[in-house]
């Protein structure tokens, strides 16, 4: 999965402008529309399903940069 595809998916899911998505974006309710722990896990699940990837170390994901570093291709 390339970073552009991740940004596109992230932007659509969270309804956030692509220009605001940077590696230091903190994934919390101040920055993400309708953020909750359940919604975050739904996002992770949708990401894994749609792109056939696995997210490792989910407990250590606090920023967009953390997210992009922990995506592992299943292929």
Q: Language-model segments: what does each one mean?
A:
Residues 1-75:
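Phosphopantetheine-dependent thiolation modules in NRPS/PKS and related acyl-activating systems
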